[in-house]
Amino acid sequence: MLELGVKHLYIEDRYSYDIEINDAIKDSTRRTGKKIVTNTFDRIKNGFIDLNTKDLKNVVEDITDELVLNEDVLLNLVSLKSTSDYTYEHSVNVSVVCIALGKMLGYSKSELYKLGMGGMLHDIGKTLIPEEILNKPAKLTDHEFEIIKNHPELGFNYLQQIESISPLSRIVVYSHHERVDGSGYPRGLKGDEIHEFARVAAIADVFDALTSDRVYRDRWPTYKAAEYIMNHTEQLFDYQLVKKFLPQVSFYPNGSEVILSSGHRAVVRTQNVGFPTRPVLRLIEDDEGNELDKELDLLKHMNIVITKVIV
């Protein structure tokens, strides 16, 4: 299984046997993307100056095609992720989120591809940052953080020599850490001074980073990451883009175990598209600990809310 790139398995029990853990793209496409990004970044770390743009182009086109054909894209990115492979998995996830959001914004297929390529390569500059800083489990010093902040410009400068990478993809690499209030880097741009592609990538980058395990902290639940994005709209993130983004997110991914305001324990069975906080649940235990096996659609029971995510 490991040789096939399968590092994690989902275990089914009597409560989850018929629950589908949906992904926005095929597992095979995700594994291919991760493998290509890994090989690409490792070559740069080892001093090679060429980039295998053909493989990158093929996988970004595949991701774009799959997302364009998927009528009801719900982003369920909080599947099992590896801390050691964070940079590579994060690159694929950011590409997926960028393309999905770009689709909601009505971008052409060509624009989606360029945005997706930018998302795939947004952290390429980190290959030129010392790994002891990138993977430091403790808080970075001010000096170390200044070094980290060089990665957008390092990545942009590296890609400037590769003509097959679109200028629009490069601008994602250069500007994905800019923030609408001017507090970002490397140039401190504000609002519409930041290209819309980069404003899209900023949301994708932060959302996936928050919902991933890191060497210095555990992942956040999806709903908490979504709340962070909402709470920092117009300060860090573009309000209009956030409005398009949040309905695409599975706040409580399929298979999540939750506690309800009624005291019941439940498992998320499926999603109500467009209503990320109101999934369909399977009740498994009442407030007195008695076992249940009953469906509850939160969209039809607005007086009940999810109060806690167990797993």
Question: What residues fall within each predicted segment?
Answer:
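Transcription initiation cofactors for RNA polymerase, centered on bacterial
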Residues: 2-44, 51, 56-59, 67
